[in-house]
Amino acid sequence: QPAPDAMVLDCGCGGGANIKTLLKLCPNGKVQGIDYSAVSVEKTRKINARAIAAGRCTVQQASVAELPFEAEQFDVVTAFETVYFWPELAQNFREVYRVLKPGGVFFICNEANGETTKDDKWTQIIDGMTIYTDTALKKYLEKAGFCQIQSHKNKKGWLCVTAQKL
């Protein structure tokens, strides 16, 4: 769980629900969100309008390939259900590493874990989707410089991975 005053970046913020939750977890912190989709950015801004007005949240259209932030700015970076669509995972993870503060944590959460037959169905119907196993994610994270990489799977197959920048 992030510290109450954490600076958090949510990559691929989608409809903004995770940002809303992160704002509650970090009542004295700030949460920034990016998404490649203009529609998602607008939805996220709508659902988090109060936090934006209070200066606790910003949301912008951007790509994880070139994060529009200074180096070492965030305590936590999250990616919920989004790394499936990142075009260059190794380079994208290096960008996340760049914007994390030393000691910062990257948190990835995916409904699909790359180890079930249902995962094949998704990649067949959704163009450009790649489902990664925990082993594959760990290799990419290590190449980007992350350490203390841990993965957890629940009974429903959700995969959560944490990685730290030292």
Q: Language-model segments: which ranges?
A:
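Short helix-loop-beta connector
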Residues: 1-7
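Short glycine-dipeptide loop
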Residues: 4, 100-105
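Class I SAM-dependent methyltransferase SAM/SAH-binding core
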Residues: 7-66
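A short acidic, Gly/Pro-enriched loop at the edge of an enzyme's catalytic core
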Residues: 65-77
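A short SAM/SAH-binding and catalytic strip from SAM-dependent methyltransferases
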Residues: 76-89
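A short glycine-rich, Lys/Arg-flanked "PGG" loop and its adjoining helix->strand segment in the class I
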Residues: 90-102
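C-terminal alpha-helical "lid/dimerization" subdomain adjacent to the S-adenosyl-L-methionine
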Residues: 105-162
